[in-house]
């Protein structure tokens, strides 16, 4: 293992030890999360105030973020994003699991998402590919479904509790 790899592993371990998904509602945090999404080429045009944004930080910078739009007992996941230097180290899995705990505390029974790049990642997390017409109208009518993500995006669902 090279010195660089060891330093990266140590930095990742430090983040992991203090990582806790936290809601961020203030304007400055929202802007920082939006910048992280942009760095990862993820959509930000329709991140409104009703999108619950969560993240974890390393020092004063966001290292990971995720968003939820809640519709009754289901939620639309908005871009799970990890700082590029931390990608491939398991942080996305941890962030997604933390998001599930938040969702279950809000009595959310299922997640929906759209992806153009992360189908395999989400399959490993228990999501299944579905057709667009299987998504509830309230979620299908969001700008994420109707205009932000391309029609070629893959639609996925995960049941958090038995329906």
Please state what every model-predicted region is.
Residues 103-116:
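Conserved GNAT acetyl-CoA-binding A-motif
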Residues 61-69, 74-81:
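Conserved beta-strand in the GNAT
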Residues 135-163:
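C-terminal "cap" of GNAT-fold acetyltransferases
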Residues 6-46, 153-155, 161-163:
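Short amphipathic alpha-helix that is part of the acyltransferase structural core
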Residues 116-133, 139:
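Conserved active-site alpha-helix within GNAT-family acetyltransferase domains
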Residues 80-87, 117:
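A short, internal acetyl-CoA/4′-phosphopantetheine-binding micro-motif in the GNAT/acyltransferase core
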Residues 52-64:
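Conserved beta-hairpin
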Residues 88-101:
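Conserved acetyl-CoA-binding loop-helix of GNAT-fold acetyltransferases
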